[in-house]
Amino acid sequence: AEIDFSGIPEDIIKEIKETNAKPPA
């Protein structure tokens, strides 16, 4: 599923992507 990043600041997008890249605890 794609996430709609429209209207979201670049730094927030980066933070979300980095969080998604981490394996679940």
From Swiss-Prot:
GO terms for biological process: regulation of blood pressure. Its main location: secreted. Residues 1-25 are annotated as: Disordered. It is found in: Secreted. Keywords: Bradykinin receptor impairing toxin, G-protein coupled receptor impairing toxin, Hypotensive agent, Phosphoprotein, Secreted, Toxin. Residues 11-25 have a biased composition (Basic and acidic residues). GO terms for cellular component: extracellular region. Transmembrane segments: none annotated. The modification Phosphoserine is found at S6. The record marks P23, P24 as: Important for potentiating BK effects. Expressed by the venom gland. It comes from the Eukaryota. One of its GO terms (molecular function) is toxin activity. Belongs to the non-disulfide-bridged peptide (NDBP) superfamily. The primary structure of this cryptide TyPep-8 is identical to that of cryptide Pep-7 from Tityus obscurus (AC P0DRF2). This is Hypotensin-2. It comes from Tityus serrulatus (Brazilian scorpion).
